[in-house]
Amino acid sequence: MAVQRTFSIIKPDAVAKNVIGKITTRFEEAGLKIVASKIKQLSKAEAEGFYAEHSARGFFGDLVAFMTSGPVVVQVLEGENAIALNRELMGATNPKEAAAGTIRADFAESIDANAVHGSDSEAAAAREIAYFFAATEVTTR
């Protein structure tokens, strides 16, 4: 099993609920290390650029509006099979379908306000990390 890096966003709904620490604890207790982190308010341009692959889909405008509705926490997580592990911790995109004990089952409201985002592949992780972090901002622990 390889050590990987993955990208995570704690979305505005979870930040507003003040559960950043609870979510971060889940990452760490599962063996993931946080090697970069920032709290930021996304601009419309940043959100549109990050989610550009969805620009032709009907939900794009609502997604951008939601992601700019409040601050987010962007993070780089590192660990054995970090991408798959993070996706397992998050649970299904729709919190109603998420397994009990997953982040989305415990903290998300809806398929739109679903608490967290995580990279779905190594290519996506590399792109998403580079979108928010310079190489000098990502450490090794």
Curated annotation (Swiss-Prot):
User: Where in or outside the cell is it found?
Assistant: Cytoplasm
The keyword Phosphoprotein is annotated on this UniProt entry: yes
Please list the residues that make up the active site. Answer: 117
Could you tell me what reaction this enzyme catalyses? a 2'-deoxyribonucleoside 5'-diphosphate + ATP = a 2'-deoxyribonucleoside 5'-triphosphate + ADP; a ribonucleoside 5'-diphosphate + ATP = a ribonucleoside 5'-triphosphate + ADP
One Pfam family assigned to this protein is NDK
Alphabetized Gene3D superfamilies for the sequence: Nucleoside diphosphate kinase-like domain
**Sorted alphabetically, which InterPro entries does this protein's record hold?**
NDK-like_dom (IPR034907), NDK-like_dom_sf (IPR036850), Nucleoside_diP_kinase (IPR001564), Nucleoside_diP_kinase_AS (IPR023005)
Q: Which cofactor does it need?
A: Mg(2+)
**Could you give the subunit structure recorded for this chain?**
Homotetramer.
Q: What does this protein do?
A: Major role in the synthesis of nucleoside triphosphates other than ATP. The ATP gamma phosphate is transferred to the NDP beta phosphate via a ping-pong mechanism, using a phosphorylated active-site intermediate.
Entry similarity comment: Belongs to the NDK family.
Q: Extract the HAMAP family matched here.
A: NDP_kinase
Protein name (Swiss-Prot/TrEMBL):
Nucleoside diphosphate kinase
Query: Could you tell me which species this protein originates from?
Result: Pseudomonas putida (strain GB-1)
Its organism's taxonomic lineage begins at:
Bacteria, Pseudomonadati, Pseudomonadota, Gammaproteobacteria, Pseudomonadales
